[in-house]
Each structure stands twice: as C-alpha cells, then as structure tokens.
Amino acid sequence: MYGIDNYPKNYHASGIGLVNLAALGYSKNEVSGGNEGGGAPKPKAGLYPSLPYPSSESVGGMPYVVKQTSHAQNASYAGPTMGMGMPVPEAPSAPAPYPSATPYPGSGLYPSLPSANVSSLPYPTAPMAPYPTGMPYPTGMPQPNLPYPAAPLAPYPSAMPGLPGMPMPYAPMPTSPAPQHNIGFPALPYPTAPPPESAPTQEEEPSVGVAELSFTSVKVPENQNMFWMGRKATSARQNSVSKGDFQSLRDSCLANGTMFEDPDFPATNASLMYSRRPDRYYEWLRPGDIADDPQFFVEGYSRFDVQQGELGDCWLLAAAANLTQDSTLFFRVIPPDQDFQENYAGIFHFKFWQYGKWVEVVIDDRLPTYNGELIYMHSTEKNEFWSALLEKAYAKLHGSYEALKGGTTCEAMEDFTGGVTEWYDIKEAPPNLFSIMMKAAERGSMMGCSLEPDPHVLEAETPQGLIRGHAYSITKVCLMDISTPNRQGKLPMIRMRNPWGNDAEWSGPWSDSSPEWRFIPEHTKEEIGLNFDRDGEFWMSFQDFLNHFDRVEICNLSPDSLTEDQQHSSRRKWEMSMFEGEWTSGVTAGGCRNFLETFWHNPQYIISLEDPDDEDDDGKCTAIVALMQKNRRSKRNVGIDCLTIGFAIYHLTDRDMQVKPQGLNFFKYRASVARSPHFINTREVCARFKLPPGHYLIVPSTFDPNEEGEFIIRVFSETRNNMEENDDEVGFGETDDRIAPSLPPPTPKEEDDPQRIALRRLFDSVAGSDEEVDWQELKRILDHSMRDVMVGSDGFSKDAVRSMVAMLDKDRSGRLGFEEFEALLTDIAKWRAVFKLYDTRRTGSIDGFHLRGALNSAGYHLNNRLLNALAHRYGSREGQIPFDDFLMCAIKVRTFIEMFRERDTDNSDTAFFNLDDWLERTIYS
C-alpha cells in the first residue's frame, strides 16, 4: 500500500476493548436526568460492546476497522487510488517485500507508558472486524523499523505524478493497487501542478512510502470527560470578578457593611444544572445559616474533610483528598487568608491551574442545601466549609455544578497542581509498577485508581466491598515491616480512600480489623497512623491491588506545581517545555495520519533532546508528551464535548530541520517513531517514551479533519529539552514561477508603445478630467474584467476595492493616479493567476487548506496563527475562500508587512508607532 499511515479509531481503551463507562463518577445517591428520584439510570446492556484490537498473529490477514462515529460513514472502497482521491502510481516491476509488523499491545490506555523503546514501538495486536467489502489486503504490512526506517528503496523515477520535475523517493509497492477507503472526508483536489510542499529528504536516513497500521480512537461516554494561554475566558460564561479581585471586593464589602453576592455565579438553578430543572427546591444558604460557629478549617484539614454528596464528582473528591497530603500544594489552591471571623464578608477565593497559568476564582459563600443540609461535597464536621467552597469554586470555573458530573481524577489533579498525569492499565503494567509508584510518592506526586465499571449495573459492588466505576485516591505507598512465624521483611502496601467516606471499604486481607495486622509491629502502626474507623480509608497489599484494580493515575508535578523554594531544592524535578496552539477548520485542522493529504497542515513542534537520562545506561532520553485540549468541560452546556485527539512523533535529520513546516512529501515517506497509543476524547492524551538524543517533530491533531479547538502541548524530560514551533517565518518570498505564463508582459515605459497606449486609454475612460481613479470607478473596471474568477458573485465588495486603493494610495487621498493604477492591475493579475492555479475545480473558491500554498505562491509567507486569523476572517463555514476574499487576504498581508517594514529600519523585527499614527494607518487600510 502506498503512502497511507492509518490510525485506528476505537472507543475506550481500557485494556479489554470497549466497555460501558456510563457509571463512572456517579455518587451513590445521585439523581440523573430523566430518572428523577431513582438514582442514575442503569446503562443498557451492550451499550458499549467490547471491541478487540488488531491481530499480531498474521499481519497478512490484518483487516480494516470501520470507524464508529455518531455520523454515517462510507466504508466502501473506490478503486486504485491512494487516499483522498489521489492517483496511485504504477508499481515497480519488482516490488520489495514488506517487512513483518510489530505487535500493538492489546490493552492499556497508554501502553507505552512503561518507557517504551522506540526501537520496538508497539503496534496493534488482536483480531479486528474483517474488511467490510471483502477487498484483499496486502499480504504484508510495512514496519517503520524504528527508530530509522530501513525498507529498501526503488530507483527514483524522473518525476512523481502531479509534481513535474520534482524527483521523489519512490516506495516499494504491492503488486495489486492499494484500495482507497472513503472515511467520510471529501477529497480535496490540489492544483493541476501543485507546488512542492517540502523537498524530499535524501540523506543517510532512508525515505520510504509508509503504510503503518491504523490508529484507533477511544470514545468515552459524554458524561465522563469534557474540558492559547489565558487569552480567553476559562469558562463558558464571562467572569467579571473571577481573577485578582478578591482583596478589592472584600475591602469594598467591609467598607459598605454588605455581604458579597457573586453576579457571575448567582444562587440560582442555572448555577446548579443546565440540562434540566431541579426536581426539588434547593435553598442557597450561607455557612452561618447552616451551622453554628462556621469555620473554614476545624482543627486543620485532612482527607477526611472530603465527603461526597449527590453530585457525580468522585473524581474531583479523590483529587481533593490527595491535595490534603501536601500542605504547599494545598495552600496554593486554598489560600489560608480567609475565614468566617476576621474580615468576613461572605467572599472566598481559590486558585486553579488552567492551561499554563494559575487562575484565581472568586465566589460568594452561598451554598445549595436541601432541608438545611449541604447537598454536594461536605466535611464530616458540619461546621467546616473549606471543601464545600472548593467544590463551588471549581463548579464556577466550569460553568455549573452539573458540568462536574463524570470525569477522571487526573483532570482535577492537574488543575490542582499544574502537573502531568500518566495512566497505567494495571493488567498490562510494567513489572516495576510498585517502584514507579514509590518514586512518584517520593516526588510528591498525586495518585488515584479505579475499577472498570460493570456494563449492566451502576456502581456495582464487588464481593470484597470495592465499587466499580468509582474513583479512589491513593494516600500512601510504602514497604511495611512485617513479622510472622514464616516470614520477616517488608511487604509492599498501598493505602486508599473511597471519597464516599463511609463503610464502603475493602473487606479482604489487610482490611480494617483484619487478623493480618497482628503481624505488624506497634511502632509501624503508629508511624502509618493506622485506625479502623468506618471512614472509607483502607489498606491493601500491592498484590491484591494488582488483582482487583484496573487503572492507576499518577500526576507528576511540573515546574508549575512548585514554589520558588522547591524549584531550588535538591529534589529531582522535570524539565518542561510548553506551547499553545489551535486547530482551525480548513487551515490547521488536518486530522490524523489517516488523512494524509491534510495531515501536514496540523501545527508542528520540534523537540530537541540533548542528553540521555542521568541514571540510565541505555543512552536514551525519557520524554513525556502531554496534549491537552482547552475549555471543553465549561462548554458542555452548549453541547460542546471533548474532541478525539492524539499525536505522532517523527525523527528529524539535520536537513529536515531546515524545512519549516514539513509538507506532504515528508509524511508520505516517513514512518512515525512514536505516537499516542490511541486518539481519545478526554481532555488530555499523555504518553511516556524512551528516545535517543536528537531532534523530533511532534504533530498534534484531532482524529478527523476540520474539527476546531484550542490546545496546549507539554513535553517533560529528565534532562534539558528545547522546544520550538516548526512554522514559517512571516515575510515576503519569491513569486511562484508557475504563474509566469499567466501574467501579462510588463508595461513598456515608452509613451508610444501600443500596450501602454491601450492601458492609458482605459485609465482615461474612467478617470475623467481629474486624472485619478476612485474606488467606485475602479470597481466598474474590475467587476467587468474579473468575471471568469468571480463565479456566482455580483462583483467585488466595496470594502475590497477600497482596500485595493488604500494599499497603493501613499498620500491617503482616496484616489489612484496612473502609475498607481498600473501597479495595482499588475498585482491583481498576479493574484488572479495564483488563484486560478489553486482553484482546480473552477468553482470560484479555493479550499482553506490551500491558503498557505496560494499565499506562498504570491510571495507572502505566514505562520499558523496568521493563517488561522485569515481563515476566521475570510473563510466560509465550509472552509472555502472566494476570489475577492483571497484578494483581501493578499492585500492585508502585503499592506501590513510593508507598514511594519517601513518602521523596522534596522531589521530587528521591532517597529514603533504612536497611537495616532497606528490608528491612522490601520483605519485607512
């Protein structure tokens, strides 16, 4: 198969295929929509049937996976084409055989977390559904042979189809043409002679036509997940008092003798839920109306202050319980400068990490109650309110309490710390998992765990007292001294807590009052604070933990998590790099590698790993890559859920480093050296890799093209790393040679030249006696002469023609003289030729994915941020840009670059304007 690197799409990577997670994160007494008074409804049996993984037994029999999505997909094949409707070149006469494929682990959300070696990168392992059409599949699949592709190359043909004069590395082909699979995204035709997107790499690293196994995506039910840097509001509603206003607001209330009432999160039903009206009346009360002698803290704080109410946010409570284990982190999130005695004005504030920065959230202290009792998170002490107010602040951050229904512990742990969370499927865990957890505990990492839910029973209880589909916090990991008649030594042990805070505890060995405790010395019991209260906390041996739990989450603390003192301490710390980005439909939302023709349009980032890990002998670097989408949970009230996201990693040679960004040809002939194990619709996708020192390209994407969203991408390493965006530099470039035949010859300067006489006659016919052309006169000329490219249009808009005049009107008279008129027509002829080169379907519009190439051909280079801005400004909902809007793009780009260059006299990329000057120039343009 030629040039296709498909990424499979699954719907929940739990290690056992696809399972029903509808029960995850609900409280025991929760009332869910449509089932009033009866608790959360039970999901239908088989709602999320198991989906096996690809087979490692016979790659030749590797079948195709039909992507299951909410919209219809065409799973047919369409003849000998190679993806997106591009023709498949003739196969070489003696194709090289495909090497065998490596297996993909059949379970685990992040199977590569145990420091997968890139030389043995995992690929899919269990049988999948057969090809829907019965089409034969090539008898072998190419293996990237990581870290460097090594499949033999056929001789270079003189040129590739559609790329005249551009010699390309040609990959071995199967003797039968590879079928095209239509995956629901329309073919995007390129110009008849498209510009080379990137030069082929011809160094010591072979280039091969890669046909990797498909990536899958993981679909988590909507009620469980959902969620650039600080430039937009962090919740669905605009918060006027959310950031930095606490002190001034409190002082104002104290001066006026009033109690604070938050206008952004009012005490109404809208702050409780968005999907329906409450089934009963809830009264919002201040702590003084709920309990006598209200306190922020009662005898300090502890994990036992976190008790779950009716809201299905056990994931949040598990993280809050973990937060109490570290006083530094705790008081960063919950500032201690507030209580119900001194300077009390009914106002409190909390701080959460949001996409690279710490955000202060200010709330009033009115809490929802029923019959005078708190209905959501609360403390065991009736007059203690820090936990209830913390939950309210987090609900405000995301728009409502209902927005907190369902989630993963790692999401809240990251918002409390700024760290990055790794997931381990315990059934596929590395043999050193306990050591990993011990080291994580020593670094102050937060940890949680859970059991897979029962697909038929909501929050089913196991015979040992554990709750399925429920989040537990891990509060201690240790080696415990044990002395029995048969054994003396240390036993790996784990302490966990159920946020329900009741008697729903583990009842097996080492449970409360278990006889095993008699073998533990008394001093050890005192050291670990052993008690047997019915408080939801219990101990387990590590072996029982492996046998009964399914997933563990470890939140590694980042530099964002640490105070200045901690950053200068001797404790080992991660090195971190972070960038923000955006997927814009038709421009930078290219979809995954399954969509080869658009994949290269995604944002690209280069990470340079310089030194191997200090304590390892393998000469490799640990890298944790975390891709997080932004502001999705807060938009659940308007039907916006998490996108299905993932990433791929490619090795770069020194020559590759000169190309910015990498184009279609790079990805057509290169295999990824690492990638996210799945595309999944959770807020963050994270994986750990072991890579040789070098340069790597990371391409984050959504699974399907044209899905819009914002994201941040972070890379953590044990040694220093350098990260940069692999993007074009803004400025002028060379005009595409291919448009030269379409351009009129330069107008001779001799006054008696026939061409100049004709142009002068045209100008005089519209200019009149004043010898100048205004925008109305220019519009009449252009509307008549540009009919062939203004398909279905009534002509140029007033704004477009005025901008053309302003571009060349140096004296700002609103009119053009003959020389300016002549220069404008020359520019328009160039832009028209470029547009026709890319409007291959002759529809009068170009696809947004071609905007970068079209502007490059016109001599203008822009980065992704500017392309996104142009697409938002001039693109249609379908991602199309008509001719007059393309001209506006070119005019704006040229005008503002020239305006900047005029003031940047020393080429320092810095220009100075006073306000009057800047407004005059921008308003007139």
Swiss-Prot record:
Residue ranges of the TM segments: none
- Binding residues for Ca(2+) 2: 839, 843, 845, 850
The known PTMs are summarized as: Undergoes calcium-dependent autolytic cleavage between Asn-74 and Ala-75 and between Gln-224 and Asn-225 to produce two major products, calpain B catalytic subunit 1 and calpain B catalytic subunit 2. This autolysis is necessary for activation of the protein.
Could you say which tissues express the protein in this record?
Strongly expressed in follicular and border cells of the oocyte. Ubiquitously expressed in early embryos. Localized to the trachea and their orifices, and to the larynx of late embryos. Restricted to the salivary gland in third instar larvae.
Q: Which SMART domains match?
A: calpain_III, CysPc, EFh
Q: Where is this region: Linker?
A: 729-748
Annotated region Disordered: the residues are 723-753
**Name this protein carries in UniProt:** Calpain-B
Organism expressing this protein natively: Drosophila melanogaster
